[in-house]
């Protein structure tokens, strides 16, 4: 890691830092104040440079760059529509198929989003755009939490060892791409990217060695840590669970100043050796805190100067909020940015807001954005599960960035510099406000993560809320839900929903079977009217089942997903599973099973899908 500036230069450096912050904040003001002009310019630039690519020529755009012609001619697409082109590029076709600039690599989407690992084309200059968005985060944050430049961030960041396509292009997760780039590895000294983890520990492909060495370095520099985090809330909690399991070995290393022999990566050992020194006093401190029966507030106990926890807690990650609050003593939970493999989108301009109020301001220069209106009635999503191809009328419904309406929900559609054209990202967003002319969105869910037996369609948000309602029955028994997933079991007729629950038991009071049956019913009562009609009237859906699994089951699930190629950095517990080996893994660790004891309430006359 670069050294900190000498003390005598701090005054000048602070002034420069303040000026840099003001420049970045001014850039946000300019981009959001001129959002529509910037969007027109972005589209014109993309279409001009890609005028001769095969995909645009096939649709007879003929070099035109105006927005109206673009909207009338170019179709709104999904991944399946361009999969043949993607495969040609992956197999080595270097002709300008999607982009006039060479495709430098493929970014693999998370294996738990929609169930497939998709290859997203990217070009070299996209790294500049990603870096630009990263550069906006801390100037925004410094408005709310001053002095962050005086310490370090303890972030648990990981890479996945990359693969190659048949044509020789790297295929890797977007964060692996960024961490392996010169933009990250050779970044100039910046107090805002001054981390406790040396680059070598982040770039270690062995997840155990990477986690161990990053945690050790974080403990050694515990007084310097001002902020902690990971990408997802689940990843940060996994780091704390790792500490719970391995603190004895970590304390031994700190006491002796000798790194565990289990860490075999030479570059990691060399990097850690520059930080790890014998410190019996620090070892005693860490041991004293970790030996306590309660781990409540462990983050603020071990890293006492921490100001906030920087993790994604929107969408289904919101279920981890109580656990984060427990470990952090209620520190602010900060979601800083919104990004995906397809494109980096926006930033949170109010980072200290409550997790339930997180909104992202889309930065108009990142890509050309359009929005497909989505209508949700009584919790049932309609157009988010539209057929792959939109009708001509639905294509005409798309609106531009500055034309979205407050409170309306939309599916995000992007046109990128790297060659995605009117591509449905699949994220459902709700407009919560505006920064000048640029809208701000809350993230609702990823589309198509649903349970379905018959005509019922239960989306991710509905499932999350139903589970949240059900677990209140566990509170009197000092029990909570650690993790969960689900699947639609159609091996019997009628089919039924199955939830796998892993519990965290703090008390000794046994939980009666009737309580879990009440949980089953509470989940069903929370579902939409179509589901309840299927249970009560149509008899097309059987009683919901909750299966309790052994502790550690969801760690096994993650390990299995990683063994198949999922990125540890991007991994999120899937809320719905369909892959038979995963269901077999979960079923092999079931300790108890409970069914809903009766049908949920349902009143006729509110049918969502009638013949009329």
Swiss-Prot record:
Keyword entries, A-Z: Ligase
Expression triggers: By auxin.
E.C. designation(s): 6.3.2.-
Leading EC class: ligase
Highest rank taxon of the organism: Eukaryota
Chain segments annotated as transmembrane: none
InterPro entries, A to Z: GH3 (IPR004993), GH3_C (IPR055378), GH3_M (IPR055377)
Alphabetical GO biological process terms: camalexin biosynthetic process; positive regulation of camalexin biosynthetic process; response to auxin
GO MF terms held by the record: indole-3-acetic acid amido synthetase activity
Record carries keyword Nucleus: no
Tagged with keyword Ligase: yes
Function, as annotated: Catalyzes the synthesis of indole-3-acetic acid (IAA)-amino acid conjugates, providing a mechanism for the plant to cope with the presence of excess auxin. Strongly reactive with Glu, Gln, Trp, Asp, Ala, Leu, Phe, Gly, Tyr, Met, Ile and Val. Little or no product formation with His, Ser, Thr, Arg, Lys, or Cys. Also active on pyruvic and butyric acid analogs of IAA, PAA and the synthetic auxin naphthaleneacetic acid (NAA). The two chlorinated synthetic auxin herbicides 2,4-D and 3,6-dichloro-o-anisic acid (dicamba) cannot be used as substrates.
Family affiliation: Belongs to the IAA-amido conjugating enzyme family.
Record-given protein name: Indole-3-acetic acid-amido synthetase GH3.5
Species for this entry: Arabidopsis thaliana
Gene: GH3.5
């Amino acid at each position: 890691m670069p050294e900190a500036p000498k003390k005598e230069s701090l005054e000048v450096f602070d002034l420069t830092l303040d000026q840099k912050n003001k420049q970045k904040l001014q850039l946000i003001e300019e981009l959001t104040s001129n959002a529509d002009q910037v969007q027109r310019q972005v589209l014109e630039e993309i279409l001009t440079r890609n005028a001769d690519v095969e995909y645009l020529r096939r649709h007879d755009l003929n070099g035109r760059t105006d927005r109206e012609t673009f909207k009338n001619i170019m179709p709104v697409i999904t991944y399946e529509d361009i999969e043949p082109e993607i495969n040609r590029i992956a197999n080595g076709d270097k002709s300008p198929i999607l982009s006039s600039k060479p495709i430098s690599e493929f970014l693999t989407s998370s294996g738990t989003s929609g169930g497939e690992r998709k290859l997203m084309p990217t070009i070299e200059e996209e790294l500049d755009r990603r870096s630009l968005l990263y550069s906006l985060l801390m100037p925004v944050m410094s408005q709310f939490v001053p002095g962050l430049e005086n310490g370090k961030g303890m972030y648990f960041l990981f890479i996945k060892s990359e693969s190659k396509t048949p044509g020789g292009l790297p295929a890797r997760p977007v964060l692996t791409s960024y961490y392996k780039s010169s933009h990250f590895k050779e970044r100039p000294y910046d107090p805002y990217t001054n981390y406790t983890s040396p680059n070598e520990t982040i770039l270690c492909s062995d997840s155990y060695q990477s986690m161990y060495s990053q945690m050790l370095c974080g403990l050694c520099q515990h007084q310097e840590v001002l902020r902690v985090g990971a990408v997802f809330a689940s990843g940060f909690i996994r780091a704390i669970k790792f500490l719970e399991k391995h603190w004895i070995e970590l304390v031994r290393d700190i006491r002796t100043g000798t790194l565990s022999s289990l860490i075999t990566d030479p570059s990691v050992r060399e990097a850690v050796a520059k930080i790890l020194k014998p410190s019996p006093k620090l070892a005693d401190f860490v041991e004293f805190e970790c030996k306590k029966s309660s781990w409540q507030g462990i983050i603020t106990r071990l890293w006492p100067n921490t100001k906030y926890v920087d993790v994604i807690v929107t969408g289904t990650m919101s279920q981890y909020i109580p656990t984060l609050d427990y470990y952090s003593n209620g520190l602010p939970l900060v979601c800083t940015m919104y990004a995906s493999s397809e494109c980096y989108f926006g930033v949170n301009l109010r980072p200290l807001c409550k997790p339930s109020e997180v909104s992202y301001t889309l930065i108009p220069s990142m890509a050309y954005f359009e929005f497909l209106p989505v209508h949700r009635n009584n919790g049932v999503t309609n157009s988010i599960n539209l057929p792959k191809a939109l009708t001509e009328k639905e294509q005409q419904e798309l609106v531009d960035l500055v034309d979205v309406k407050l409170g309306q929900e939309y599916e995000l559609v992007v046109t990128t510099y790297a060659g995605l054209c009117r591509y449905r990202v699949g994220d459902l967003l709700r407009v919560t406000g505006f920064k000048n002319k640029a809208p701000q969105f809350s993230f609702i869910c990823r589309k198509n993560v649903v349970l379905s037996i018959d005509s019922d369609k239960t989306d991710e948000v509905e499932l999350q809320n139903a589970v949240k309602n059900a677990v209140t029955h566990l509170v009197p028994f000092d029990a909570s839900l650690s993790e969960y997933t689900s699947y639609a079991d159609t091996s019997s007729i009628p089919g039924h929903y199955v939830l796998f629950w892993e519990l965290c038991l703090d008390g000794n009071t046994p939980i009666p079977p009737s309580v879990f049956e009440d949980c089953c019913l509470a989940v069903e009562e929370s579902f939409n009217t179509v589901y309840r009609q299927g249970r009560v009237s149509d008899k097309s859906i059987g009683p919901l089942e909750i299966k309790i699994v052994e502790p550690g089951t969801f760690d096994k699930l993650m390990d299995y997903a990683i063994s198949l190629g999922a990125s540890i950095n991007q991994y999120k517990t899937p809320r719905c599973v369909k892959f038979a080996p995963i269901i077999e893994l979960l079923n092999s660790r079931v300790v108890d099973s409970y069914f809903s004891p009766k049908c949920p309430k349902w009143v006729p006359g509110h049918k969502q899908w009638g013949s009329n």
